[in-house]
A protein has these predicted regions:
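Flexible "cap/lid" subdomain of the alpha/beta-hydrolase fold that forms the substrate-access gate
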Residues: 2-9, 16-18, 25-28, 40-42, ...
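Structural cue for short, hydrophobic secondary-structure segments
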Residues: 31-34, 57
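Conserved alpha/beta-hydrolase "nucleophile elbow" surrounding the catalytic nucleophile
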Residues: 33-35, 102-103
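The serine-hydrolase catalytic nucleophile loop
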Residues: 35-46
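C-terminal capping segment of individual leucine-rich repeats
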Residues: 48-51, 254
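Active-site machinery of serine-nucleophile hydrolases
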Residues: 50-59
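Conserved short acidic donor-positioning loop in nucleotide-sugar-dependent glycosyltransferases
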Residues: 266
Length: 288
């Protein structure tokens, strides 16, 4: 049986000190957050999954309670930098292979890892993933009205404005957590407070925004062979405003070993919006 609660740890990979939580025993299963996220976004999933797996949930570089490298985004916050952190992390634990569940920006980093180190990835689960088949649809009308934040995050003063007070940080984070959920009233005050505290850590807003800056500066793989042959299940919420379900149309081109499931009535944060359904899907797919 899983222990009562996850334990907190730190390790250093590629010169970056990463915070992570761990719970359970068995085959390793990593849960990797996106933006605006950190380890806590999986708090409804860690315990149930830990009854079946050794669950490991990091704060990635630049986020929450991990180090925030003071490097240009196109150097320190590329998909390759994050992929190398994942590789170094599993090397630290001497894992031959891992299973990974991820979404949002985490899906970008993990796709890069899957292409660089396919032999290290046993199975993959993605929620509403950004992927190459979306192309320029982010900035077509009317979707561009949902994607404005990606341009805002390019501004050098963005973190100063959002971080000018905890109240400002709360307003900004609460907007995305609510607007991207099928039920905008889902989030409790305690949950919002946890996010605000994480993003009030020195450099945390900048670290998250740097991921978007890196993407706009050529820091994400967009050419060459973008195929991922790892057995992959994609769960896509049909109420996700920022990544509409229609964008799943080209997944088979890039994931030839694909299982796609439409999650009805679920928005962008399905791990929080429908944890029981999500946990059951993960366990069913990941168990050999």
């Amino acid at each position: 049986m899983a222990t009562a609660s996850p334990s907190h740890h730190y390790t250093t990979v590629n010169g970056v000190k990463l915070h992570y939580v761990r719970q359970g025993a068995g085959e390793p299963l990593m849960l990797i957050h996106g933006w605006p996220g950190f380890w806590f976004e999986w708090h409804k999933n860690i315990g149930p999954l830990a009854e079946h797996f050794d669950v490991i949930v990091p704060d990635m570089r630049g986020f929450a309670y991990s180090d925030k490298p003071d490097l240009p985004p196109e150097v320190g916050y590329t998909d390759t930098a994050f992929a190398e952190d994942i590789r170094a992390f599993i090397d630290f634990y001497h894992f031959d292979k891992v299973r990974i569940v991820t979404h949002d920006f985490g899906a970008v980093w993990v796709q890069r890892f899957a292409r660089m180190y396919p032999e290290r990835l046993h199975k993959l689960v993605l929620f509403d993933p950004p992927y190459a088949g979306i192309g320029g649809r982010w900035f077509e009308l009317p979707q561009v009205f949902h994607s404005w934040y990606q341009i805002f995050h390019q501004q050098p003063w963005a973190e100063d404005l959002v971080g000018s007070s905890k109240e400002a940080t709360e307003i900004y984070l609460r907007h995305f957590l609510s607007a991207w959920s099928a039920n905008p009233d889902l989030w409790t005050d305690d949950e919002i407070a946890a996010y605000v505290e994480a993003y009030s850590q020195p450099g945390a807003l900048r670290g998250g925004f740097n991921c978007y800056r890196a993407a706009f500066r050529g820091g994400m793989q967009s050419s060459g062979d973008l195929t991922i042959n790892t057995p992959t299940m994609v769960l896509w919420g049909d109420s996700d405003a920022i990544l509409p379900y229609a964008w799943s149309d080209r997944l088979p081109e890039f994931f030839p070993n694909l299982t796609l499931k439409r999650m009805e009535g679920v928005g962008h944060f399905m791990m929080r919006e429908a944890p029981e359904r999500v946990n059951a899907e993960i366990i069913g797919f990941m168990k050999d």
